[in-house]
C-alpha cells in the first residue's frame, strides 16, 4: 500500500484584490488533485470566500478515504475497495478506518471481543420502542435512540479523553445493529430479539432482524456475506453531508452519541 503523503506543496497561486497581490499555497492531494490553501486569506487581505454549497471547498485534509464515483474508485486508507471486499470482513475494515491500519490476529480478536461486550442496549431503552408509533420512520427511531445513548452511558462522553472516545466508538458499532433491528421488529409487531455474541457481526444482525422466539433461526451464509459486502462498501464515503454534519456538531465538543445522532438526521434526507 502506498504511503499517504498528505497535502504536498506545489507552488503558489497569485490573487489580486484592488491592485494588491497575495500569494496562496497550492497543495496536491494523494491522487494528484490540486487545491488552494486559503487559511491565511482573511488575515492577509481582509477578504473571505463565498462558495455556496461548498462545491469547490475541501473542509479538511484526510488520510481515511478517497472516492471518485465517476471513475468507480473507492479506497480506504489507500487500500482499493475491491481488495478489502475480497480479503476482509466488515469488522476488519472498521478497524482499518478507525486505527489507520489492518489489525493483526491478536488485535482483531481483541476488537471483536470489545464489540461483543457492547451488543446489548440498556434494558430501559427497550421501552422507548413502545412509545413510537408502529409506522414511525426508521431514521427517526435510529436518531432518537442513538442520541439517548448519551443518557445511559455517561462514562464515555468526554471527547477530550481518547479512551472514552474509543469506548463510545465500540459501543456505537456494537449497538447500532441492535437498535436498527429493534426498529424493524417494532414496525412489524414482532418481539425484540436479543443479540447473540456467538455469531459474527452480520449473522447477529440478521438473527435480530428475522428470528422469532417460537422457532429456531438459521442464518443463510450467502445473506451474511452479502450484508458484509454491503457494509464494507458503505463504511465511509469521504466528506459527505452526514460526515460533515458529525464533524460540525463534534467541533463544539458534543459527545460522540450526539454527533452521530445529528449525522443520522443528515443522512435521512433524500439528497
Question: What feature does the model see in each segment?
Answer:
Residues 3-271:
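Hydrophobic alpha-helical bundle cores within soluble ligand-binding/oligomerization subdomains
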Amino acid at each position: 500500500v502506498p504511503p499517504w503523503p498528505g497535502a504536498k506543496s506545489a507552488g503558489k497561486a497569485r490573487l489580486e484584490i484592488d491592485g494588491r497581490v497575495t500569494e496562496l499555497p497550492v497543495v496536491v492531494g494523494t491522487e494528484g488533485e490540486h487545491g488552494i490553501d486559503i487559511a491565511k486569506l482573511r488575515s492577509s487581505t481582509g477578504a473571505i470566500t463565498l462558495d455556496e454549497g461548498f462545491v469547490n471547498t475541501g473542509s479538511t485534509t484526510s488520510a481515511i478515504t478517497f472516492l471518485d464515483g465517476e471513475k468507480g474508485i473507492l479506497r480506504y486508507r489507500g487500500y482499493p475497495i475491491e481488495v478489502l471486499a475480497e480479503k476482509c470482513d466488515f469488522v476488519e475494515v472498521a478497524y482499518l478506518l478507525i486505527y489507520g491500519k489492518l489489525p493483526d490476529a491478536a488485535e482483531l480478536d481483541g476488537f471483536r471481543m470489545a464489540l461483543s461486550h457492547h451488543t446489548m442496549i440498556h434494558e430501559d431503552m427497550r421501552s422507548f420502542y413502545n412509545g413510537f408509533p408502529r409506522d414511525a420512520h426508521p431514521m427517526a427511531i435510529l436518531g432518537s435512540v442513538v442520541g439517548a445513548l448519551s443518557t445511559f452511558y455517561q462514562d464515555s462522553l468526554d471527547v477530550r479523553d481518547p479512551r472514552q472516545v474509543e469506548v463510545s466508538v465500540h459501543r456505537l458499532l456494537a449497538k447500532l445493529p441492535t437498535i436498527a433491528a429493534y426498529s424493524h421488529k417494532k414496525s412489524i409487531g414482532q418481539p425484540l430479539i436479543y443479540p447473540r455474541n456467538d455469531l459474527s457481526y452480520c449473522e447477529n444482525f440478521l438473527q435480530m432482524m428475522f428470528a422469532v422466539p417460537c422457532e429456531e433461526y438459521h442464518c443463510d451464509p450467502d445473506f451474511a456475506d452479502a450484508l458484509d459486502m454491503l457494509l464494507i462498501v458503505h463504511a465511509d464515503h469521504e466528506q459527505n453531508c452526514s460526515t460533515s454534519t458529525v464533524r460540525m456538531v463534534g467541533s463544539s465538543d458534543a459527545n460522540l452519541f450526539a454527533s452521530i445522532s445529528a449525522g443520522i438526521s443528515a443522512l435521512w434526507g433524500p439528497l
